[in-house]
Design a protein with these regions (language model features):
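Alpha-helical transmembrane segments and their membrane-interface boundaries
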Residues: 1-161, 305, 310, 315-469, ...
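All-alpha amphipathic helical-bundle segments outside canonical DNA-binding/catalytic cores
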Residues: 227-228, 585-590
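C-terminal functional regions that serve as terminal interaction/effector modules
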Residues: 465-473, 485, 684-686, 690
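Long, intrinsically disordered, low-complexity regulatory segments adjacent to structured domains
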Residues: 592-595, 599
Length: 773
């Protein structure tokens, strides 16, 4: 992508306003907390302290809006306390330029590095550094600075208390995550009726798993509907795929296929009903026809083999989902102990060493988080020096704008810079007009500031433009409440905001952290995770007891994590003005399609894992070992820009005995797995041999010239492959059930069909009413 197109796309993204579900009650609660803090501060301490405490309450309320599964009161208290500490330390060093610059560089570096611990911590830390640049100018003594810091902590405590006293959908985010996962599976079941090999985006399941990780206090108060349904939902997906896939299920046509279509439609209706009940905390209302579809005895008479087992398994899992979604007490379907232990979330105190460890692991050359920390600290120092040198008097606007817009990736940094400047112009213009018309006093300015803050809380998820406009107006009214005339803040803020945005954009262009060169590494990590997942699944057939084998569930989760990392990297790379450097967009799309096919085949084999007392399959052990070794070598080849080869897997399949083995699942799945691996090699083999045509030497299309002929091309006059010397067709010596050359591979998309993942949704699926879109 060229720079012009990249700037055009990021500008459009920054100036766009999305339609999102608004939360007026949550916005009203945040504005009420801000009003309480300002009123108390004005009554007892005066306008300057009120402005400082307002910044603390304002930032604490923003922290409660972050997409985090942690309790909201903890976020509010942490935000207010960290801003108070930053303000006090900043004021102590504010009188000495060198000391303050050193503190600013250190604070911004740590804030940039905190993105390694997660986006929530990164956003809170960056916002606190930006707010500190303003709040250190308000106190007039060390004692006053301590008082201002204490009032900022008080603002965070007030917001936390309001969250506890007036909860709005206390478990709403967790309910939405689990309901979105069930709704995504309902949509998947309906799509399988039209496309038996339809892809499935595992992001909703991973989001639900993240939401299921709770602190000990959360685990004690979790609603009964949120216990156990996620684990059941993860087991439903492979059963749906195995029931619909003709490779291991039923034929494409006939009464068996008709029965499978009915079962898939009923499964979609049942999953939608469960998702609706969990989302709203209401009883389950299931269509009677959907339940009757699974209870009819015709299913056992029509289906047989793996399809019959999959149908029975699906009916049992759906029954468990309905019972869990309709549970009103904690005694129904509790999650296993081992799963609860794996999904425990550390408390806020225990999170500190974990976050420090994550930040320490990013201290290596080439880390995108480290490069972001270096960028943001350098820009903050340079911006502060430029703002101080300019004859405006409020030099903190430039570094504040830069720190607020800078993010670890290119598209967000540039789009936020555009939105910041555009929103500042709009907000400042509106605030200036109101000031000139109303000439507000201290209390009216405070009222207008609270109103702007409430509007910002309401529209902050619709886009950066609207949020930045509200923030700009809020700051104008808040500083006006503190005694500064609007004419002293408006012009300089517009100019210095532009300076800060330009510095942020220039810093990323000079010292970037492009994702495009790391695409091969992400692809290799995904391939390696899929190889380990496939080896764990196939190894279960060799040792059904699974005494010393790796856990299939852990391998599956690792593969999903690697897939999400690839999707995020590919999405960022599409917006970067960088050449592909060996992995074009077409090759990346083809490789992604091949890896999705690999994961799907492995999921089908997982759906039919043998019981612990089943007969072992020795050939599966050799195949599992060959697959693990081949994918490790293949991942190394992908990183080194070579084409991976799969001779070890091919040899293991050639030595497969096959007697006493469920051929429709294991052996056929292994063959499909090898085909998908070869598709991956074809996608990465982008070297095309040059073709030279000499106009003075006539030749026919079927007879390449000697200097253009590949080593495996037949000589002129030689019989074509598949025929004898006399031209007669050779008998077909392929194994029964093997696909014909050139035939459509099982699991491959039909000609003209879109590739899986070509248009990935930007977030989790919507409500279950629109799941069949």
């Amino acid at each position: 992508m060229s720079w012009f197109r990249a700037l055009k796309d990021t500008t459009r993204s920054g100036l766009s306003v999305e339609r999102k579900r608004l939360e007026p009650l949550v916005a009203l609660r945040g504005a009420a907390g801000l009003a309480i803090v300002i009123t108390v501060s004005l009554t007892f301490f005066g306008p300057a302290v009120a402005a400082s405490s307002a910044f603390g309450a304002f930032q604490a309320a923003i922290a409660t809006f972050q997409r985090s599964w942690r309790p909201r009161p903890e976020l509010a208290v942490a935000s207010g306390a960290s801003l108070g500490v930053s303000t006090f330390l900043g004021y102590l060093t504010g009188g000495h330029l060198v000391l303050f610059l050193a503190l600013l560089v250190l604070w911004t570096f740590l804030a940039g590095l905190s993105w390694a611990a997660g986006p929530t911590i990164g956003i809170i830390a960056s916002s606190n550094v930006a707010m500190m640049l303003v709040t250190i100018t308000l106190p007039t003594s060390v004692t006053a600075a301590a008082g201002h810091a204490a009032m900022m902590v008080f603002g965070g405590l007030v917001q936390a208390a309001l969250v506890i006293l007036f909860p709005v959908r206390r478990w709403g985010a967790h309910r939405d995550a689990l309901a979105d996962a069930l709704a995504a599976e309902a949509d998947y079941a309906r799509r399988l009726r039209h496309d038996p090999v339809a892809p499935f985006d595992g992001e909703p399941l991973m989001l639900a798993r993240n939401a299921a990780a709770l602190t000990p206090r959360q685990a004690r108060t979790r609603p009964a509907q949120l216990r156990g349904a996620r684990g059941i939902a993860e087991r439903i997906r492979p059963v749906l795929a195995s029931l619909a896939d003709p490779a291991v299920g039923v034929p494409d046509e006939g009464p068996e296929r008709e029965r499978v279509l009915e079962l898939l439609g009923a499964a979609g209706s049942i999953l939608d009903a469960a998702a609706r009940a969990i989302r709203h905390g209401a009883p389950v209302k299931v269509p009677p026809a959907a339940v009757a579809t699974f209870k009819t005895p015709d299913t056992g008479a029509i289906l047989s083999g793996p399809a019959k087992r999959a149908a029975a398994r699906l009916g049992s899992l759906l029954t468990d989902v309905l019972e869990t979604a309709g549970a009103r007490t904690d005694t129904q379907h509790p999650e296993p102990r081992n799963e609860n232990a794996q999904l425990s979330r550390p408390t806020l105190v225990l999170l500190l060493p974990i976050a420090a460890g994550a930040m320490r692991r990013e201290l290596y050359r080439g880390s995108p988080i480290l490069r972001h920390a270096i960028r943001v600290s350098a820009v903050a120092a340079v911006g502060y020096l430029i703002g101080t040198a300019l004859p405006f008097g409020h030099g903190y606007w430039a570094p504040m704008a830069a720190v607020m817009v800078m993010r670890p990736d290119f598209s967000q940094t540039y789009s936020r810079a555009v939105a910041r400047f555009g929103g500042t112009l709009i907000g400042v213009a509106l605030a200036t007009g109101l000031v000139q018309l109303a000439h507000p006093d201290t209390r009216l300015s405070a009222t207008l500031a609270v109103t702007c803050a409430g509007l910002m809380y309401l529209v902050m998820r619709t886009g950066q433009l609207a949020a930045q406009a509200c923030i700009a107006a809020y700051v104008v009214f808040l500083l006006g409440m503190g005694g500064e005339a609007w004419g002293q803040t408006v012009p300089e803020r517009v100019v210095l905001t532009l300076v800060g945005g330009l510095l942020a954009m220039l810093a990323y262009a000079v010292y970037p952290a492009w994702e495009t060169p790391r695409l091969r590494t992400r692809l290799a990590d995904w391939l390696l995770a899929l190889g380990r997942y496939g080896a764990a699944v196939i190894g279960r057939y060799a040792d059904p007891g699974g005494g010393n084998l790796p856990d299939v569930r852990e391998a599956l989760l690792a593969a999903r994590t690697a897939e999400l990392a690839w999707q995020e990297a590919a999405s960022r790379a599409r917006t970067e003005p960088v050449r592909h450097r060996g992995l074009s967009r077409a090759a990346a799309d083809d490789a992604e399609h091949a890896l999705r096919h690999i994961g799907r085949v492995e999921m089908l084999m997982e759906a039919h894992l043998p019981e612990r007392d089943a007969t072992p399959v020795p050939a599966a052990a050799r195949l599992a070992k060959a697959l693990r070794t081949a994918t490790e070598d293949g991942a190394r080849a992908v990183r080194e820009r070579r084409v991976p080869r799969w001779q070890a897997v091919r040899d293991a399949l050639a030595d497969w005995d096959g007697e006493g083995v469920p051929d429709r699942v294991v052996r056929r799945g292994a063959g499909l797995l090898l085909e998908a691996l070869e598709d991956l090699s074809d996608a990465l083999d982008t070297d095309v041999p040059p073709i030279t045509l000499k106009p003075d030497a006539p030749h026919t299309p079927d007879d390449p010239k000697p200097d253009d002929r590949r080593p495996d091309d037949p000589k002129p006059g030689a019989p074509k492959p598949g025929t004898s010397k006399s031209g007669a067709q050779k008998p077909d010596d392929r194994k029964p059930g093997a696909p014909k050359p050139g035939a459509l591979k099982p699991g491959a998309p039909k000609p003209g069909a879109p590739k899986p993942g070509a248009q990935k949704p930007e977030g989790p699926p919507g409500p279950e009413d629109r799941a069949a879109q």
